[in-house]
């Protein structure tokens, strides 16, 4: 199988076949640790990877939520375009949202401080795309985005404070 969009189709289809045979192979349970780095800065660790959120010159946590969502859909569209053999010249996702920080700064009896609205736009340059391929990619964005799905549902959360 060929390489499309710098990805090996064979690798993608092989993983898909593996998951079809055993759905537990699709399970993920990542744990990240955020460390305070002074002022409003955090250093995030996941295994041997590190990212910085907040502080001078970095995305703040709420911007990072949008960034993670946009990046997730870039990955999703690129992967599915590859699987259907569609060459992508360029791809970007623009995400924006509204939130209010009254509750975050400690004002009482105010609505939650999370996003209450998010909009996003996929900008795809794939001159050979058919209308069926575009419809398929739109469907994947609407139904298969892990972060989009997370944002759209009530997620069970547990909390400890030590």
Label every model-predicted segment.
Residues 68-73:
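Alpha-helical metal-binding/catalytic segments enriched in His/Glu/Asp
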Residues 1-67, 79-162:
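Extended beta-strand/beta-hairpin segments
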């Amino acid at each position: 199988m060929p390489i499309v969009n710098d990805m090996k189709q064979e690798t993608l289809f092989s993983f898909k076949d593996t998951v079809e045979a055993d759905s537990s192979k699709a399970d993920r349970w990542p744990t990240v640790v955020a460390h305070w780095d002074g002022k409003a800065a955090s250093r995030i660790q996941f295994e041997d990877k590190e990212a910085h959120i907040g502080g001078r010159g970095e995305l703040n946590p709420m911007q990072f939520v949008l960034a993670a969502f946009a990046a997730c859909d870039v990955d999703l569209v690129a992967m599915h375009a590859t699987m259907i053999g569609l060459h992508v010249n360029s791809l970007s996702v623009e995400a924006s949202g509204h939130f209010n920080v009254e509750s975050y700064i400690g004002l009482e009896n105010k609505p939650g401080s999370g996003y209450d609205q998010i909009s996003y736009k996929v900008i795809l340059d794939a001159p050979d795309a058919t209308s069926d391929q575009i419809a398929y990619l739109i469907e994947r964005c609407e139904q298969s985005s892990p972060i989009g799905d997370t944002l759209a549902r009530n997620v069970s959360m547990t909390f400890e404070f030590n």
